[in-house]
């Protein structure tokens, strides 16, 4: 299963206009990547962070507010918090991991307080720590990364991982999008914190979230988990990229002629919206919010209202068109499989955090975004950074004896005669994963039909020529990553012949108790899927 699909080439001394050495390379500069960098540096590691955009402003968290799974250790609060989500996620979460995340989130929030994050206070003066304002949060995290001594490479997407002769990950190569220059980072360990894959659906902050890290990890043999839990659709205005759905709990949904749609809702009833959208437009109005709630909404998530104000629409009194945008594994739970508490993947030297990693461990097959994902990002980032630091310092001590190989495949080391059109590939993938009738409501024959086209498209890509320029390489790798992601998720969805969490099968509409297991997947030319047991709670 770890067999590579492309020939690996020796890294030469001429590779890379800029060359870096460090103990730990963190790929991705969102909350998970920032926490990983800070944590690794605190362990005494030399840290390099490479971000596809500008660390602190790119990604799903930076432009918006998010809830946070911040629960007091007092009384039964945490037990109740865990129990409230177990059934929703299909009973695939594990108590030990939920306990760890709840505690690490509590500890890291105390750090945020010490660092000066401005949590608001309630009427009694107690700080409310159950939400974070993305812009303020990520400005602070960028500042902390720099103060930790880590070096940041902005606008510098990674293209491929480096491995030694034993298959241990030891760095990456990439490009600077502004200068076009290539870079090489030789490190003792790598943390993948590149986020999930939203398939360029134009959801807010998701334009950089194309599954690049998962592709690079799969090229070195890493396994993924829970990729069937990848059909999360964000609810939002048809004219806006904002998919923050909390406020729609106060909405009524209507047809074009003003008739309320029975059963339609945000938390429960989103399937009714998806079903209706297949045949006609759907409109919403936040007409169930009273004056006090309306005032709170304006202060809680001000960016929610920007597009309405520009359009001259009052969302509390006027009907506006809504849509469901695919957010894939960003708001889903699938991602890289983790094999122990340090957040190491199935490949030595490679760690994963945030939405790049599976969140089944705390959410099972459903998250809803926000709260749990935010807690997972700051916790898994903290652990992955510490784990990578411990591994990386030891590995760097032996680095001079290593043979270093480039692991990238499609658009980098493929040997065809002509390049492929990245935009054409993106459109082809979107045509298979966007439609509600294929992805929201899944069915075996439709999944097989999509996979036949997606597999054929992969065969075309793997026999193409390498990208000619740095810009083309970035776009080509994004397209390849989205294609690979779609194949892992549909292969996994085909094997899970039940409805569990966010995964829905038309012909298997009920939960099957015999399928209470996770599904690991991987591979590129040949995608594989296998069962993986959920760890049971051990009685004290």
PLM feature spans:
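Glycine-rich loop(s) and the adjacent beta-strand/alpha-helix scaffold that form part
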Residues: 189-241, 364-387
């Amino acid at each position: 299963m770890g067999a590579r699909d492309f020939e690996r080439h020796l890294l030469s001394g001429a590779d890379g206009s800029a060359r870096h050495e460090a103990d730990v390379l963190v790929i991705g500069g969102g909350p998970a990547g920032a926490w990983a960098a800070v944590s690794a540096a605190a362990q005494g590691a030399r840290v390099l962070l490479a971000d596809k955009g500008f660390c602190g402003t790119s990604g799903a968290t930076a432009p918006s507010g998010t809830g946070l799974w911040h629960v007091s250790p007092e009384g039964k609060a945490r037990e109740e918090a865990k129990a409230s989500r177990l059934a929703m996620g299909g009973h695939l979460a594990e108590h030990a991991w939920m306990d760890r995340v709840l505690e690490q989130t509590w500890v890291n929030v105390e750090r945020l307080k010490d660092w000066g994050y401005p949590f608001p206070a309630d009427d009694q003066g107690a700080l409310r720590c159950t939400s974070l304002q993305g812009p303020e949060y990520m400005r602070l995290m960028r500042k902390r990364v720099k103060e930790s001594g880590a070096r940041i490479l902005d606008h510098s997407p990674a293209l491929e991982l480096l491995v030694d002769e034993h298959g241990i990950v030891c760095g990456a190569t990439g490009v600077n999008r502004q200068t076009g220059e290539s870079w090489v980072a030789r490190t003792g360990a790598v943390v993948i914190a590149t986020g999930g894959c939203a398939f360029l659906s134009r959801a807010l902050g998701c334009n950089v979230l194309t599954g690049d890290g998962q592709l690079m990890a799969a090229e070195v043999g890493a396994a993924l988990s829970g990729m069937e839990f990848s059909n999360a659709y964000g609810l939002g205005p048809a004219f806006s990229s904002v998919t923050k759905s909390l406020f729609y709990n106060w909405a009524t949904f209507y047809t074009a002629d003003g008739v309320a749609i029975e059963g339609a809702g945000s938390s429960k009833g989103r399937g009714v919206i998806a079903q209706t959208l297949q045949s006609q437009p759907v409109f919403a109005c936040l007409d169930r919010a009273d004056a006090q709630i309306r005032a709170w909404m304006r202060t809680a998530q001000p960016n929610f209202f920007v597009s309405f104000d520009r359009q001259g629409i009052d969302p509390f009194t006027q009907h506006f068109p809504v849509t469901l945008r695919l957010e894939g594994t960003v708001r889903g739970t699938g991602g890289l499989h983790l094999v122990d508490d340090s957040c190491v993947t199935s490949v030595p030297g490679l760690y994963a955090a945030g939405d790049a990693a599976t969140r089944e461990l705390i959410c099972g097959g459903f998250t809803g975004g926000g709260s749990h994902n935010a807690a997972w990002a700051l916790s898994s980032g903290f652990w992955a950074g510490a784990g990578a630091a411990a591994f990386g310092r030891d590995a760097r001590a032996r680095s001079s004896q290593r043979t270093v190989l480039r692991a990238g495949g499609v658009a980098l080391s493929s040997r065809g005669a002509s390049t492929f059109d990245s935009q054409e590939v993106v459109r082809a993938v979107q045509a298979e994963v966007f439609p509600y009738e294929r992805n929201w409501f899944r069915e075996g024959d439709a999944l097989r039909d999509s996979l036949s086209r997606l597999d054929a498209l992969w065969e075309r890509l793997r026999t193409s020529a390498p990208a000619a320029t740095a810009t083309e390489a970035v776009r080509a790798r994004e397209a390849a990553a989205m294609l690979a992601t779609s194949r892992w998720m549909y292969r996994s969805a085909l094997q899970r012949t039940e409805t569990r969490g966010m995964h829905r099968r038309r012909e298997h509409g009920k939960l099957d108790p015999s399928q209470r297991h996770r599904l690991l997947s991987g591979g590129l030319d040949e995608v594989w899927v296998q069962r993986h047991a959920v760890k049971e709670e051990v009685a004290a």
